[in-house]
């Protein structure tokens, strides 16, 4: 186990440790981000955008590594029923991004896309809200939707919001899909919207 910090150069690792990782790692699953829906972009940027920059540097250091990048469907603007597809040009949404988290994920995905165009083997995944494990029921206790459900159960009522859909894709479904896709080089350079 290696403990690092995405917001730091070389993940905050000493040079020897970083070099050893760079020489021995062939595949990177990048799913780290700062998740706080109330923070502005400036507070989310160091870990989400800076961290993505560090992952790209790492993937190019000493030898090329494949990157499986977990983005978010938050890179699409909300508020309507428009279906967004994998091949939508996200540059079309740049001026409609709201919230620091969504803005940072949009920028991070752009960085990954440009790295892919320069030859880095990358596959991108855009999950929606990641929910419980479909078998064990284990869930992130600090996820905002989990907290809303807990609050509703505790107080015995729920918001009246007829158009509010609680979309939660089971974490085990996502993990299985991402690892299966990662095994096939024909998926490099592709984007997958992943909502079950």
Label each residue range with its predicted role.
Residues 45-49, 97-106, 142, 164-168:
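Short-chain dehydrogenase/reductase
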Residues 1-27:
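Conserved Rossmann-fold cofactor-binding substructure of NAD(P)-dependent oxidoreductases
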Residues 49-55, 104-112, 148:
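Conserved catalytic Lys-bearing alpha helix of Rossmann-like short-chain dehydrogenase/reductases
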């Amino acid at each position: 186990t290696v403990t690092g910090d995405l917001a730091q150069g070389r993940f905050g690792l000493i040079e020897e440790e970083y070099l050893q990782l760079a020489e021995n790692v062939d595949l990177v699953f990048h799913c780290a981000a700062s998740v706080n829906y109330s923070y502005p972009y400036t507070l989310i940027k160091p870990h989400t955008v800076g961290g993505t920059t560090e992952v790209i540097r790492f993937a190019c250091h000493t030898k090329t590594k494949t990157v499986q990048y977990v983005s978010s469907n938050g890179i699409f603007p909300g508020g309507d029923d428009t279906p967004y597809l994998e091949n939508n040009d996200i540059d079309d949404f740049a001026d409609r991004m709201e919230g620091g988290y969504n803005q940072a994920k949009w920028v991070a995905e752009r960085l990954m896309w440009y790295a892919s165009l320069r030859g880095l083997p990358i596959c991108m995944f855009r999950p929606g809200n990641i929910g419980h494990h479909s078998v064990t029921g284990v869930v992130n206790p600090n996820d905002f939707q989990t907290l809303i459900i807990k609050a509703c159960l505790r107080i015995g009522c729920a918001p009246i919001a007829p158009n509010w859909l609680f979309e939660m894709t089971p974490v085990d479904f996502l993990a299985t899909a991402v690892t299966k896709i990662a095994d096939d080089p024909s998926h490099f350079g592709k984007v997958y919207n992943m909502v079950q």
